[in-house]
């Protein structure tokens, strides 16, 4: 019999950062007796989940994909954002054979290049500098018809902040002497990830057939009209800009988001021959449909930047050592606790089980701030009591998903719901002698108002995240930890040597 405490639970509180500023801080405002008690009585500290510490540009806020990659890999994972930006700076982007091949096919036949993507400086799913570079590449290679179908952000950026991004792209096209913004739509429609196909169909029909609820002469005018209708960037309805632009046979389409999870549904509509999620009015015979990165191995679209493989991530190494593991989350974060935590692998490892709890079907999560966290917790408590698993990895989506709504009162309720859930897990572990690590992937809910603009702060933050050890061992939390140190910490608690690929080091040291 092993003497290792069982199970070891990694609790990832999504979007749950730490800020010393009490104003507009949903964690500070919430009643959190469990969290307060754990921090008062157990080894705890703060670790970094942003910038260079997670493989992003310095000062860039973290996000869920990046956070889970680093948590599961046990090493700093240099992100697609960083790879693409570097390629643009050193000129390799403009020689990328996937991108140049697609553009050349269309341009040589006098056809159009359509650029799709989130027009934003948020850096979470995309970056506007990448869209600028793609427009420049298309122009350099002789494309005369270059159209940007812009998805507006307002979620990883302030709710009404798209004007400067539109101005940047308008200026880019003016400088190039060709190309223009052809359509606007909020990311709520174009970048769904929860099978709300009515939203995706609005984006698809806008891009392919220029079918729009609204029209405007310029993108600036379209944005102003949306604001007059009280639509913030995220929720801007399908708007045609200028003369109708359709995706015709022989055109090339390039999707410039680098993050996969919110690019999959729209991409499927473009490339799956037997697509049935909604009735496509038309499926053009494109010269090429390209993703900036690989959105899924199952989506038949070449990637300009192919995934770099990660070996001996935590899940794989646990399987090699005969350990069992459970991954559990609700829909919104299921991909993060499985695909991203496993280093970009879709299939479970040997001895790995997965539980998906459907997210509630509400328009926005401020309407149900507890989401389905209680049901997630029911399944975790059950798994702890059964003692079938050596390791349980759970993601609670509330801090991030409710934080993104910008509704402070709802965010406070979300934090209080999390506190109750964590308390139930800690109680269940106490009964069986298990252990837990409580942390987060990035900040969000600790800052709910932008101190500069006074607008709701709906984006992630660069704040550090909590790290708490729940267990009986005489340990303390060292300073200077990062997300990549969490997997090595778990291996230490499990009594396993870390593999050579894991360059992170344990956050827990002898007290």
Swiss-Prot record:
The keyword Nuclease does not apply. It catalyses: (2R)-2-phosphoglycerate = (2R)-3-phosphoglycerate. It is an enzyme of class 5 (isomerase). Its EC number is 5.4.2.12. The active site is at residue 64. Pathway: Carbohydrate degradation; glycolysis; pyruvate from D-glyceraldehyde 3-phosphate: step 3/5. Pfam families: iPGM_N, Metalloenzyme. One of its GO terms (molecular function) is manganese ion binding. GO terms for cellular component: cytosol. Keywords: Glycolysis, Isomerase, Manganese, Metal-binding. Binds 2 manganese ions per subunit. Mn(2+) 1 binds at residues 400, 404, 460. Its cofactor is Mn(2+). Mn(2+) 2 binds at residues 14, 64, 441-442. Substrate binds at residues 125, 155-156, 187, 193, 259-262, 333. GO terms for biological process: glucose catabolic process; glycolytic process. Belongs to the BPG-independent phosphoglycerate mutase family. Catalyzes the interconversion of 2-phosphoglycerate and 3-phosphoglycerate. HAMAP family: GpmI. Monomer. NCBIfam families: pgm_bpd_ind. This is 2,3-bisphosphoglycerate-independent phosphoglycerate mutase. It comes from Pseudomonas putida (strain GB-1).
């Amino acid at each position: 019999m092993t003497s290792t405490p069982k199970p070891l639970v990694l609790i990832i509180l999504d979007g749950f950062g730490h800020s010393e500023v009490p104003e507009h801080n949903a964690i500070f405002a919430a009643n959190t007796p469990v969290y307060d008690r754990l921090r008062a009585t157990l080894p705890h500290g703060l670790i970094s989940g942003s910038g260079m510490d997670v493989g992003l540009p310095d000062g860039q806020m973290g996000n869920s994909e990046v956070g889970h990659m680093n948590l599961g890999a046990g090493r700093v994972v240099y992100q697609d954002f960083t790879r693409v930006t570097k390629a643009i700076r050193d000129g390799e982007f403009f020689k990328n054979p996937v991108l140049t091949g697609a553009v050349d096919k269309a341009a040589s036949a006098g056809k159009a290049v359509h650029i799709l993507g989130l027009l934003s400086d948020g850096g979470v799913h995309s970056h506007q500098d990448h869209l600028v570079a793609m427009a420049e590449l298309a122009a350099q290679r002789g494309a005369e018809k270059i159209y940007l179908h812009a998805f507006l952000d307002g979620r990883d950026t302030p709710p009404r902040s798209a004007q400067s991004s539109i101005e940047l792209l308008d200026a880019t096209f003016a400088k190039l002497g060709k190309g223009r913004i052809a359509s606007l739509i909020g990311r709520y429609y174009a970048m769904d990830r929860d099978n709300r196909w009515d939203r995706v169909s609005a984006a698809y029909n806008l891009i392919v057939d220029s079918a729009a609820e609204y029209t405007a002469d310029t993108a600036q005018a379209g944005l102003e009209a949306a604001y007059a209708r009280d639509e913030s960037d995220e929720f801007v309805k399908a708007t045609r800009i200028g003369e109708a632009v359709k995706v015709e046979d022989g055109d090339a389409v390039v999707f410039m988001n680098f993050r996969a999870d919110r690019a999959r549904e729209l991409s499927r509509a473009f490339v799956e021959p037997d697509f049935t999620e909604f009735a496509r009015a038309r499926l053009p015979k494109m010269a090429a449909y390209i993703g900036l990165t690989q959105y899924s191995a199952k989506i038949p679209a070449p990637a300009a930047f192919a995934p770099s493989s990660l070996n001996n991530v935590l899940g794989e190494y646990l399987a090699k050592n005969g350990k069992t593991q459970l991954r559990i989350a609700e829909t919104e974060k299921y991909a993060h606790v499985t695909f991203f935590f496993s280093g970009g692998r879709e299939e479970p490892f040997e001895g790995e089980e997965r539980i998906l709890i459907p997210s509630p079907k509400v328009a926005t999560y401020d309407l149900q701030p507890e989401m389905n966290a209680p049901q997630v917790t029911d399944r975790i408590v059950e798994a702890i009591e059964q003692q079938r698993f050596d390791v349980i990895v759970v993601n609670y989506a509330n801090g991030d998903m409710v934080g993104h709504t910008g509704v402070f009162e709802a965010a406070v309720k979300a934090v209080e719901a999390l506190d109750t859930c964590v308390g139930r897990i800690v109680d269940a572990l106490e009964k069986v002698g298990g252990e837990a690590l409580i942390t987060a992937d990035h900040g969000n809910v600790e800052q709910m108002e932008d101190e500069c603009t006074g607008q709701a702060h709906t984006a992630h933050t660069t704040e550090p995240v909590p790290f708490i050890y729940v267990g009986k061992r005489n340990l303390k939390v060292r300073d200077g930890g990062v997300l990549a140190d969490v997997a090595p910490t778990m291996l230490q608690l499990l009594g396993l040597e870390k593999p050579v690929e894991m360059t992170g080091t344990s956050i827990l040291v002898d007290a």
